[in-house]
Amino acid sequence: MEGDRISQVRAELTRLFDEQVEFFRRRAQRQPTPAELREYQERRERIRQLFAELRGLREAA
């Protein structure tokens, strides 16, 4: 079951990284709105949480 969770975490990380890249592409063209900055920060925090979870899963394996 841990393998399933690792796959889920990886998929979510991929999606979040894609969204972060898109944020930086848009930012190169214009200033982000306060809502876009907040979403960026929320994604960044979620990425940190997911990496911590992955570390825990790998240590438990």
Residue positions per predicted region:
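Short, charge/polar-rich alpha-helical segments
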Residues: 1-14
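Short, charge-rich amphipathic interface segments used for partner binding and complex assembly
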Residues: 11, 15, 21-60
